[in-house]
Amino acid sequence: MGLRKLKNIKHGGKTLTEILESHQRFFRGQEGGVRADLTGADISHADLREINLSGAILRNTNFEQSDLRKAKLPGADLSGAKLGKADLRNADLTEAILPGADLSEAQASGIEFFRCDLSNVNFQNAKLRNVNLRLANVHGAKFSGADMGVAILRETDLTGADLSGVDLTTTLMPKGYAGAQAKIKGA
């Protein structure tokens, strides 16, 4: 089964295409624009490549197994969103809000997570190669089994994060990091 098209997905009586057009007008400051609020929407198995949802309200939205490659989501509120097995490669989530989101088994390599709230996010078994987690809040986040090769964790407080089973040999860690801040296999 292929990915669903935007015109075939409805939320609140409107198609996703209509919601996105209105959001683009809002984002540009044009008349008639409305910030996208897709709280609780089912947008799973959808083709959302290069979509611009900057600043959108996406709380508890189901994006499972959707294609979000190169999506623009800076400042978006993805609290509690379901992104398991989604493809988020090279998406921009700068300053996005994701507490409690599920990104388990997501393909999330190359993501910009700069200054994100990633508290209590489930990253278990996710592919997080070349991600930037500088200044992100990762308290309570579960990274166990994730592939974090060449990830940037500089200036990130890892207190309370679960990094068990993660190979950190090529990961750029915070200066002076000793491993006691986070749960690490063998630490």
What are the functions of these language-model segments?
Residues 1-2:
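Long, contiguous interaction/recruitment modules in multidomain scaffold/adaptor proteins
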Residues 5-18, 24, 28-187:
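Tandem repeat scaffolds
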